[in-house]
Amino acid sequence: MKLRFLGAVGTVTGSCSWLQDPARGWNFLVDCGMHQDEPDGAPGAPKDWPFDPATLQFVALTHAHLDHCGLLPALYRDGFRGPVRCTPETAELARLVLGDAARLPGSGITQADVDRILWKPFREDQPFGQPRPVDQDLFLRTYRSGHIPGAVSMEVLWGAPGVGQRNIVFSGDVGPGGEDAEVAPMLRFPWNPRSACFAVLESTYGGTVRTPQERDPALRLARLHALVAGIVETGGTLLLPAFAVGRTQDLMFDLHAVVAADPLRLRDLRIVLDAPLARRVQGVVARAMQRVDVMRDKVRPLWLGKQVFRQLGLDDTEPDDIQAALDIIAMTLTGVRGDGSQPIARGNALAQQWRALTEPPTKAAPDRGRAPQGPTVIVCGSADGCGGAAASWLQILLRDARHVTATTGYTAPHSVMGRVATLADLPLKERRRHPGRIEWSDGRTLPIRDIGATVTRLRGYSAHADQADLLDWVFLCRQGGDGVVAPTLFVQHGGDRERVALRAAILQRAAETGQRISVVLPQRADEWVSLEGQPATPPA
């Protein structure tokens, strides 16, 4: 078996890894993502495939973000006819995400391209961590990665099961936190993989160590409450541009929690979800939270986190409490409970005061031409602010001092929200001196001197692991062995500064603990790496 990294080499986006064993007839990809927001553009255009797409057997997909699945339509358009193997949740979400991308001008794909994709989700009646055969002596095994619902780390195993079988595990995008130290509002903790011969690790925040304050869910909620309470006082609007998959659902859950914790003070607050893709995603995520993993000796929620039960004072071993948690998730994401509209009668005061707050999708779309009347939170699509609802709202709300705009995660420096975020630390009187302007691709502009709204960064919502989390992924593998996830580790999916910092941290931890590990930073997309050089690690 040999491996070639076709994307995310020294960049954050464009994940695509090509695995091949000509002697055994194996030829497949792990992920097939597009480049996004990279300064050097997207070198991996469909015409540049280094293979004939018709010769590929399958694509193993880690999750449904465009930087991992965005080139699938082009791959099928250019001749690929095999299946995409992934979790059922990833298949559902990717259909929506790719369909939405096909509607964007200049995307280069059409709905017909998306409809060609042959999704082959993993069977739900098999335990999640069980190897799944895809060919003679070729298997895939998944581990929940804690990034978004459906997201997994993907292990490839080849050779007859037992001693001598070889394997490589691709991290996909790893989420923050761990068991009983969850950071995300709803999603269950990431799994550590079993030890392998080789591993590939993302490094989006490989050089970042978040403070305890940034990781503390209680402080995250307190920061959100302060913003919401502020606009209730001013009668203004809080604008939260957010990613449609993952980030929007987390924000909606926390907004409902904030109101449930302070119902009298916030009783007049209006919450608007102005994001067509996110509205379609909400139901998929609500259904995903119902899924359980039935193993030999236990049954556990697959995607619904333990932290939800702790926050709501519910017992995750009691069927009625489990149903109460699922009802709260359904109210939050879809506005409808599964068993009617009676208040929740179990759990703590927060659970019992929880109400569905978002307006139903059947209601007329909000008027983006003027600011809402009364205190309002708008969660909108287009997290970069460059188009869609965010672009319209920004041009209305940024001018008025009553309003607040907050970033909810990473924004590319050259994007609209990236430029807006730079104003967070610039006092209003200094903005008045600023000669620059915010520009949109349709020609609309807004002078920075005219921006009177408060601009802030709402921290705590990143769905990516930081350096400490990534070190845990490397050194806290589920299986014994040599104490590291693999003796050879490839670090990609990150800028070079992040990759170099992560490599240094890994080598330092290895030296301190007496572990041996080789950390490789792939540099070129045209080089093959042999996967036959390490002694086989028998996968258990």
Predicted ranges, named:
Residues L71-L75, D254, A389-I396, W473, ...:
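A short acidic, amphipathic alpha-helical/loop segment
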Residues R223-R419, K429-E430, G483, Q492:
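Hard-cation-handling environments
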Residues R432-V474:
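Generic long, charged, amphipathic alpha-helical segments
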Residues A389-L397, S462-G483:
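A short, acidic, amphipathic alpha-helical segment used as a generic capping/interface helix at domain edges
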Residues E512-W528:
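Conserved phosphate-binding/catalytic loops in two-lobed NTP-binding clefts
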Residues Q57, A196-C197, T376, H403, ...:
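Conserved acidic residues
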